Design a protein with these regions (language model features):
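Short beta-strand-to-loop transition segments that serve as allosteric relay/switch motifs
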Residues: 75, 136-145
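Allosteric cytosolic regulatory segments
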Residues: 156-164
Length: 232
């Protein structure tokens, strides 16, 4: 959203930075190759705006309901296996309540769960779209009180914009997948109508089936009723 008073951004360097970060995130809706690429770029953009030593972008899994780290910077390589339930840890609390949280000193926070030694300060904000929490952006610092309330407010704005961008990219990817499936069905119907030779028809069926479900392999078996067995 454009600033009604552009001169105010010039007088306030922090406001100008805020607008630049929001614009960089918003532009990913049209420039990112896919949602996975956008996640990596979003985290890099956000981390560069704060004195953060590590950070992560975690998403709520529709299959397990858990909070799974999609991308991270500065954390141990095996942190991808580190999954939290909603309400568990600081990021889990943010995911469950859909509210940002700042912890100036993690040593005095009973909800804190360590993913990296040396972290002293942490803040997290929800990724959301259409009123639903999609995940959490989490930043860590090795200095006590490294993040302020103003930083948390900024992170909340960035995370909200990031959630909108990712939601749009996921919608586009679903539409593209549906379009590809429709194209495959049309091609399959055309093959049946043109009455291909049996060998060609079977080959078309397997190729179309593989493309339709984006599968690595598709096999078509012939059932022998007398022997009660399948033949490849």
């Amino acid at each position: 959203m454009a600033d009604p008073n552009p001169q105010s951004a010039i007088r306030d360097p922090q406001s100008a930075t805020d607008l630049a970060v929001l614009h960089a995130i918003a532009s990913l809706a049209s420039s990112a190759a896919d949602a996975a690429s956008a996640q990596r770029q979003i985290l890099s953009i956000i981390m560069a705006a704060f004195p953060a030593d590590s950070g992560s972008l975690a998403l709520l899994s529709p299959e397990t309901g858990g909070l799974e780290i999609g991308v991270q910077q500065g954390l141990p390589s095996d942190v991808g296996e580190f999954a939290l339930k909603p309400g568990q840890g600081i990021t889990g609390w943010v995911a469950l309540h859909g509210q940002p949280l700042l912890v100036p000193d993690v040593a005095h926070e009973p909800r804190y769960i360590s993913a990296r030694a040396g972290v002293r300060c942490e803040m997290a904000a929800p990724l959301s779209a259409d009123g639903h929490t999609l995940g959490v952006v989490n930043l860590d610092a090795d200095r006590l009180g490294a993040f302020t309330d103003a930083d948390l407010a900024r992170l909340t704005r960035y995370a909200a914009e990031a959630g909108t961008v990712l939601h749009r990219l996921w919608q586009y990817e679903r539409l593209r997948a549906h379009s590809q499936q429709l194209t495959t069905l049309v091609e399959l119907g055309h093959a049946l109508v043109t009455q291909l030779a049996p060998e060609e028809l079977l080959s078309t069926l397997t190729q179309s089936g593989r493309a339709l479900f984006n599968a690595r392999l598709c096999l078509l078996h012939d059932y022998d009723g007398e022997r009660r067995e399948l033949r490849l």
